[in-house]
Design a protein with these regions (language model features):
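…primarily DNA-binding HTH/wHTH and HhH modules…
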Residues: 128-146
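Residues within helix-turn-helix
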Residues: 63, 74, 110-113, 123-124, ...
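Residues within the alpha-helical elements of helix-turn-helix
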Residues: 68, 117-118, 133
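Terminal helix-turn-helix DNA-binding modules in bacterial transcription factors
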Residues: 49-50, 54, 82-121, 143-146
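Short hydrophobic/aromatic patch on the recognition helix
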Residues: 76, 80, 125-126, 130
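Inter-domain helical "communication" segments and dimerization helices
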Residues: 1-75, 82, 86, 143-146
Length: 146
């Protein structure tokens, strides 16, 4: 039953990504992929991803999450990379940037506001990370979204 539900969820996520890709191509917009967590049996990885989703706006890092889960940073780092294909920090950054891309589609919102809403107090650093992952600046992304 859980396996069937997971397959349905993955299929829906795949369809959403396909639609995002199609829309992005039509608008010449970059697409940022964030692989869904694989069929993991590791409860710590599931819990870590859930903590990222709940606290990405805050000052969260592998140390705070490992502490919350009462496991070592080294262990969390190893299993997280194995299960997601990303380091913890890379996953967190990509998650934040996907959220930022969604927020930037509203042309009324300022880049510094988006940066703050996705957990960055330094707008320049946010912009550099955004450009590194998408190939364009947040303001250019916002302009293309119009």
């Amino acid at each position: 039953k859980d396996g069937e539900l997971e397959l349905v969820v993955r299929r829906i996520q795949g369809q959403e990504e396909a639609l995002e890709s199609k829309a992005a191509k039509e608008q010449d917009m970059p697409v940022l992929r964030l692989n869904p967590v694989k069929n993991t049996k590791n409860k710590y990885v599931e819990q870590a991803v859930q903590l990222i989703r709940e606290h990405f706006r805050e000052d969260i890092n592998i140390s705070t999450v490992a502490g919350e889960l009462e496991i070592s940073e080294g262990y969390l780092s190893r299993v997280f990379k194995k299960e997601t294909d990303y380091t913890f920090t890379s996953y967190l950054t990509r998650y934040r940037m996907k959220k930022a891309m969604s927020l930037l589609k509203d042309c009324r919102v300022k880049v510094y506001e988006v940066a703050e809403q996705v957990g960055y107090s330094d707008t320049a650093y946010f912009s550099a990370q955004f450009k590194k992952l998408t190939g364009i600046s947040p303001s250019e992304y916002q302009d293309r979204s119009r």
